[in-house]
Amino acid sequence: MSRIFVVYGHHNVNKSFNQEIRDTFCSEAKKLGHEIDLINLHAEKPIPFYDGSEPSEQILDYRKRLEQSDVLFMISPCYNLRATAILENWIDLVLAPKWFFSFKR
């Protein structure tokens, strides 16, 4: 089956609707035979804000795990029509141009 990389970006890890989504999704996916690689951004070592520097070992590790996955599933509450800052920062650093995508000329 598929390997699913789950990125959880909510500060309330025990009593939130997002936590219920995370737990239900992971449980049901495992029942179907999928492998789950879950990170909780609030439990991980904090990553710096994007400043244009070379990616850290932590970011390279996230990219490696993503490359080994078939599916990326991100979970975050929506504040002012946006994901949480911690998830948006993760997206900026991990899913960066030239590595995750490129622009056509």
Residue ranges and their predicted role:
Residues S2-H34:
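N-terminal beta1-alpha1 ligand-phosphate binding loop
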Residues M1-F5, R65-Q68:
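Secondary-structure boundary/capping motif
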Residues N12, A43-E44, Y79:
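Short, solvent-exposed loop/turn segments at secondary-structure junctions
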Residues L38-Q58:
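N-terminal beta-loop-helix "entrance" segment that forms/cooperates
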Residues E54-R105:
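Helix-loop-strand module that forms the ligand-binding subsite of alpha/beta enzymes
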Residues G33-I36, K98:
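Secondary-structure boundary/capping signal
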Residues D37-I39, M74-I75:
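Short beta-strand segments at enzyme active-site cores
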Residues K15, I47-P48, L81-A83:
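Short catalytic/ligand-binding loop motif for oxyanion handling, primarily in non-cytosolic enzymes
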